[in-house]
Amino acid sequence: MRCNAVRTGTLRRQIGTWQGIAEGGGLSAPHVSWPGLNEYDSHAVIAAIHHEPLPKPDTPELYRHHFRLLRDGLAAWMAGRVQPAGMPSYVDFRAGVIGALDHVRQNFENEVLLVSSGGPIATAVAHVLDAPFEASIELNLRIRNTAVTEYAFNPKRHQLITYNTLPHLDAPPYRDWLTHARG
């Protein structure tokens, strides 16, 4: 893998992921933190529609309940029916993600690595495909941890090349490493 520039969200886990990629791949591209790549707060999204405390989801039934609430909360946030505490509006969240894509198109010609999280990745994919916001909910809940989504871009637009791939974990010894939300 090679890249000429790196943008990550400002979250510790996103920066840590970049540091691991850089160390493992021997990369030294310039890195800039980009707040528009930050993840939404799933707890705040759920709390916006379900005000009582929830038990830790540690059974199949509680996992299903958690992801039903998350889907409903995301749909309400995206439609502007709720405003989760401490979060931007969905319009602003989406604008931050699109701003990162626009920044890449306007400032680079090739190989830019964006290190983010499921919500921004799904939002970017839905935007590039001109899909309705509801599609980003399902895209988000299918993203596998450490998955790669690849775009081609020119000064006018991005094009989706791959979504949710794990080329770095394709070998048999890594099969047990695959994880994702079971929503």
Residue ranges and their predicted role:
Residues 1-71:
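Phosphate-coordination/substrate-recognition cap region in phosphate-metabolizing enzymes
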Residues 7, 110-116:
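Beta-strand elements within well-structured catalytic alpha/beta cores of enzymes
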Residues 20, 123-127:
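Active-site signature of alpha/beta-hydrolase-fold catalytic machinery across serine-
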Residues 27, 32, 40-62, 91, ...:
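Acidic, low-complexity terminal tails and accessory targeting/binding regions
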Residues 78-94:
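Surface-exposed cleft-lining segments at the edges of enzyme active sites
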Residues 94, 98-105:
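Generic structural signal for well-ordered alpha-helical scaffold segments
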Residues 103-108, 117:
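Conserved nucleotide-sugar donor-interacting segment of glycosyltransferase catalytic cores
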Residues 118-122, 154:
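GST superfamily/GST-like fold recognition
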